[in-house]
Amino acid sequence: QASDLAKRALSKLLGLLHLGDRLIFVDRALHEKKILFIKLHETGHGWLPHQRDTYALLEECEHTLDPDVRDAFEREANVFAGEVLFQLDRFTQDAADCSFGVRTPLQLSKRYGSSVYAAMRRYARTHAEAVVLLVFDPPDAIPGLGFEATLRRAEQSDAFTARFGRVTWPGKVSPDSQLGALIPIGRRMSSPLPV
């Protein structure tokens, strides 16, 4: 039982920071862009003073972090990694210098070494224009309905929020809904659409 639990925990481990030796261990089976993000994430744990000090204490004892604190630390390390990866506002400035559209984050993902998904999210969240990005999981076939797709992530720019408010998007869509009709069956993404 204990070895199964340890194996399951290790299978979820993508990266690990050893503060004492100043080493970061990363699962090499991951995609190279994910490895870069994980390295930056683990660097965040070591660079943010309150996290570094807390983890240094925990390495010396058998105590663990409260789950809520651990979740907060993980979110902070993710933010740190994103800010470093996209060089604070540099990505946003570069995007503003390019033509408006889906090709811009695709091109910038190569320049910044990020995944396309991360670049699209950053583009939607930080663009000066009204932009929304809706990411759905691959649709599941539903007999009699056609399919159902679950919303994984919604990102909207401040300009979108100012114009339309904080939209509550449906958690699931099917072909008979307005959003469901836009799901790109057999393709990775739909074309950009004006509002």
Segments from the language model and where they lie:
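Active-site hotspot residues in diverse enzymes, especially metal/ion-binding acidic/histidine motifs
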Residues: 1-195
